Amino acid sequence: EKQGAGIQLSMSARITIRNNSIYDLPRAGINVSEGTWGGHLIEGNDVFDTVLETGDHGSFNSWGRDRYWHPDRNVMDEFAKEHPQMVFRDATETTVIRNNRWRCDHGWDIDLDDGSSNYHIYNNLCLHGGLKLREGFARTVENNIMVNNTFHPHVWFANSQDIFRHNIVTTPYRPIQVKEWGKETDTNFFVTKQGLEQA
Protein backbone atom coordinates (compact mmCIF):
# COMPACT_ATOMS: atom_id res chain seq x y z
CA GLU A 1 0.00 0.00 0.00
CA LYS A 2 1.29 3.45 -0.87
CA GLN A 3 2.20 5.54 2.16
CA GLY A 4 3.66 8.60 0.44
CA ALA A 5 2.47 11.99 1.72
CA GLY A 6 2.97 15.54 0.53
CA ILE A 7 4.56 16.30 3.91
CA GLN A 8 5.58 13.57 6.37
CA LEU A 9 6.52 14.17 10.02
CA SER A 10 7.96 11.42 12.20
CA MET A 11 9.62 11.66 15.63
CA SER A 12 10.00 15.42 15.43
CA ALA A 13 9.20 18.57 17.40
CA ARG A 14 8.04 22.12 16.70
CA ILE A 15 7.80 21.91 12.91
CA THR A 16 5.80 24.67 11.17
CA ILE A 17 3.87 23.79 8.00
CA ARG A 18 2.43 27.02 6.62
CA ASN A 19 0.80 28.39 3.45
CA ASN A 20 1.11 25.37 1.15
CA SER A 21 -1.10 23.99 -1.60
CA ILE A 22 -0.89 20.19 -1.42
CA TYR A 23 -2.86 18.05 -3.89
CA ASP A 24 -2.97 15.07 -6.32
CA LEU A 25 -1.62 12.49 -3.86
CA PRO A 26 -2.10 8.74 -3.42
CA ARG A 27 -2.33 9.11 0.37
CA ALA A 28 -2.35 12.03 2.87
CA GLY A 29 -1.44 15.60 2.09
CA ILE A 30 0.10 15.96 5.56
CA ASN A 31 0.87 12.91 7.71
CA VAL A 32 2.16 12.72 11.30
CA SER A 33 3.21 9.14 11.97
CA GLU A 34 3.92 9.26 15.70
CA GLY A 35 2.93 11.61 18.48
CA THR A 36 6.57 11.95 19.51
CA TRP A 37 7.16 14.88 20.33
CA GLY A 38 4.60 17.23 18.91
CA GLY A 39 4.43 20.99 19.25
CA HIS A 40 3.86 21.38 15.49
CA LEU A 41 1.99 24.29 13.90
CA ILE A 42 -0.01 23.50 10.76
CA GLU A 43 -1.75 26.59 9.38
CA GLY A 44 -2.87 28.37 6.22
CA ASN A 45 -2.69 25.28 4.00
CA ASP A 46 -5.03 24.23 1.18
CA VAL A 47 -5.01 20.42 0.96
CA PHE A 48 -7.26 18.59 -1.52
CA ASP A 49 -7.43 15.71 -4.05
CA THR A 50 -5.78 13.32 -1.60
CA VAL A 51 -6.16 9.59 -0.84
CA LEU A 52 -6.52 8.98 -4.58
CA GLU A 53 -5.02 5.46 -4.60
CA THR A 54 -5.62 4.15 -1.06
CA GLY A 55 -8.27 4.25 1.68
CA ASP A 56 -8.85 4.63 5.44
CA HIS A 57 -6.95 7.90 5.55
CA GLY A 58 -7.43 11.67 5.32
CA SER A 59 -6.08 14.86 3.77
CA PHE A 60 -4.54 15.35 7.20
CA ASN A 61 -3.72 12.04 8.83
CA SER A 62 -1.98 11.06 12.03
CA TRP A 63 -1.55 8.07 14.24
CA GLY A 64 -0.16 7.89 17.74
CA ARG A 65 0.80 4.34 18.64
CA ASP A 66 3.13 5.81 21.20
CA ARG A 67 4.48 3.88 24.19
CA TYR A 68 1.20 4.04 26.10
CA TRP A 69 -0.99 2.82 23.23
CA HIS A 70 -2.47 -0.68 23.23
CA PRO A 71 -4.87 -2.09 20.59
CA ASP A 72 -7.18 -3.61 23.26
CA ARG A 73 -9.79 -1.05 24.27
CA ASN A 74 -10.38 -2.58 27.73
CA VAL A 75 -6.67 -2.33 28.52
CA MET A 76 -6.66 1.31 27.40
CA ASP A 77 -9.75 2.23 29.43
CA GLU A 78 -8.13 0.89 32.59
CA PHE A 79 -4.81 2.50 31.73
CA ALA A 80 -6.43 5.90 31.16
CA LYS A 81 -8.12 5.76 34.54
CA GLU A 82 -4.93 4.83 36.38
CA HIS A 83 -2.36 6.89 34.44
CA PRO A 84 -4.06 9.85 32.68
CA GLN A 85 -0.77 11.78 32.21
CA MET A 86 1.10 8.91 30.53
CA VAL A 87 0.00 10.01 27.06
CA PHE A 88 2.07 13.18 27.42
CA ARG A 89 5.35 11.30 27.81
CA ASP A 90 5.62 11.03 24.03
CA ALA A 91 3.27 13.75 22.73
CA THR A 92 4.90 16.24 25.08
CA GLU A 93 3.66 19.41 23.34
CA THR A 94 0.32 20.27 21.76
CA THR A 95 0.16 20.16 17.96
CA VAL A 96 -1.98 22.99 16.53
CA ILE A 97 -3.96 22.65 13.29
CA ARG A 98 -5.64 25.95 12.42
CA ASN A 99 -6.92 28.12 9.57
CA ASN A 100 -6.60 25.45 6.86
CA ARG A 101 -8.89 24.27 4.07
CA TRP A 102 -9.18 20.48 3.72
CA ARG A 103 -10.96 18.26 1.22
CA CYS A 104 -10.81 14.48 0.95
CA ASP A 105 -13.31 12.70 -1.29
CA HIS A 106 -12.03 9.22 -0.38
CA GLY A 107 -11.64 9.48 3.40
CA TRP A 108 -11.78 12.14 6.10
CA ASP A 109 -10.70 15.74 5.70
CA ILE A 110 -8.96 15.50 9.10
CA ASP A 111 -8.22 12.00 10.43
CA LEU A 112 -6.63 11.55 13.87
CA ASP A 113 -6.24 7.79 14.12
CA ASP A 114 -4.87 5.09 16.46
CA GLY A 115 -3.97 7.04 19.56
CA SER A 116 -3.22 10.49 18.12
CA SER A 117 -3.12 12.70 21.21
CA ASN A 118 -2.51 16.27 22.39
CA TYR A 119 -3.97 18.28 19.47
CA HIS A 120 -5.76 21.63 19.24
CA ILE A 121 -7.75 21.87 16.01
CA TYR A 122 -9.59 25.11 15.27
CA ASN A 123 -10.80 27.50 12.54
CA ASN A 124 -10.54 24.91 9.77
CA LEU A 125 -12.85 24.50 6.79
CA CYS A 126 -13.55 20.84 6.00
CA LEU A 127 -15.22 20.57 2.59
CA HIS A 128 -16.18 16.91 2.19
CA GLY A 129 -14.89 14.18 4.52
CA GLY A 130 -15.54 15.64 7.96
CA LEU A 131 -13.33 15.13 10.99
CA LYS A 132 -12.46 11.86 12.74
CA LEU A 133 -11.00 11.34 16.22
CA ARG A 134 -10.15 7.74 17.09
CA GLU A 135 -8.58 6.26 20.24
CA GLY A 136 -6.64 9.22 21.54
CA PHE A 137 -6.47 11.73 24.37
CA ALA A 138 -6.49 15.49 24.98
CA ARG A 139 -7.81 16.67 21.62
CA THR A 140 -9.66 19.97 21.52
CA VAL A 141 -11.66 20.60 18.35
CA GLU A 142 -13.45 23.96 18.15
CA ASN A 143 -14.71 26.61 15.71
CA ASN A 144 -14.43 24.39 12.62
CA ILE A 145 -16.90 24.12 9.75
CA MET A 146 -17.71 20.69 8.28
CA VAL A 147 -19.52 21.03 4.95
CA ASN A 148 -21.41 17.99 3.59
CA ASN A 149 -20.23 15.87 6.52
CA THR A 150 -19.80 15.75 10.26
CA PHE A 151 -17.87 14.64 13.31
CA HIS A 152 -16.74 11.00 13.46
CA PRO A 153 -15.83 9.97 17.03
CA HIS A 154 -14.48 6.41 16.92
CA VAL A 155 -13.66 4.19 19.91
CA TRP A 156 -13.17 6.88 22.55
CA PHE A 157 -11.53 5.80 25.78
CA ALA A 158 -12.75 6.53 29.27
CA ASN A 159 -11.14 9.72 30.59
CA SER A 160 -10.05 10.79 27.09
CA GLN A 161 -10.12 14.52 27.97
CA ASP A 162 -11.42 15.18 24.42
CA ILE A 163 -13.39 18.36 23.68
CA PHE A 164 -15.62 18.99 20.63
CA ARG A 165 -17.35 22.39 20.85
CA HIS A 166 -18.46 25.46 18.86
CA ASN A 167 -18.29 23.66 15.50
CA ILE A 168 -20.71 23.73 12.56
CA VAL A 169 -21.67 20.30 11.20
CA THR A 170 -24.04 19.63 8.29
CA THR A 171 -24.99 15.99 8.96
CA PRO A 172 -25.59 14.00 12.20
CA TYR A 173 -22.57 12.75 14.17
CA ARG A 174 -21.33 9.29 13.14
CA PRO A 175 -20.00 7.64 16.30
CA ILE A 176 -18.52 4.13 16.29
CA GLN A 177 -18.16 2.26 19.60
CA VAL A 178 -18.40 5.41 21.69
CA LYS A 179 -19.31 4.67 25.31
CA GLU A 180 -17.78 7.86 26.73
CA TRP A 181 -18.23 11.29 25.14
CA GLY A 182 -15.03 12.87 26.39
CA LYS A 183 -14.69 15.93 28.59
CA GLU A 184 -17.07 18.12 26.54
CA THR A 185 -19.19 17.64 23.43
CA ASP A 186 -21.46 20.68 23.39
CA THR A 187 -22.51 24.00 21.83
CA ASN A 188 -22.16 22.78 18.25
CA PHE A 189 -24.40 24.06 15.46
CA PHE A 190 -26.39 21.59 13.36
CA VAL A 191 -27.83 22.58 9.99
CA THR A 192 -30.76 20.16 10.37
CA LYS A 193 -33.13 19.34 13.22
CA GLN A 194 -32.35 15.64 12.66
CA GLY A 195 -28.66 16.23 13.36
CA LEU A 196 -29.41 17.97 16.63
CA GLU A 197 -31.88 15.28 17.74
CA GLN A 198 -29.37 12.50 17.09
CA ALA A 199 -26.54 14.26 18.94
Predicted regions and their residues:
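Leucine-rich repeat domain C-terminal region
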Residues: 189-193
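Short glycine/acidic-rich loop motifs that flank beta-strands on beta-rich extracellular proteins
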Residues: 1-5, 26-35, 51-58, 72, ...
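Right-handed parallel beta-helix
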Residues: 1-30, 39-46
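Solenoid scaffold repeats with emphasis on beta-solenoid/beta-helix
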Residues: 14-15, 20, 39-40, 45, ...
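Consensus "Asn ladder" position of solenoid repeat domains
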Residues: 20, 25, 40, 45, ...
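Short, flexible loop/turn elements at secondary-structure junctions
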Residues: 11-15, 21, 34-36, 51, ...
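Surface-exposed acidic, glycine/proline-enriched linker/cap segments
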Residues: 1-4, 64-93, 97-99
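Active-site core of glycosidic bond-cleaving carbohydrate-active enzymes
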Residues: 94, 115-132, 138-149, 163-166, ...
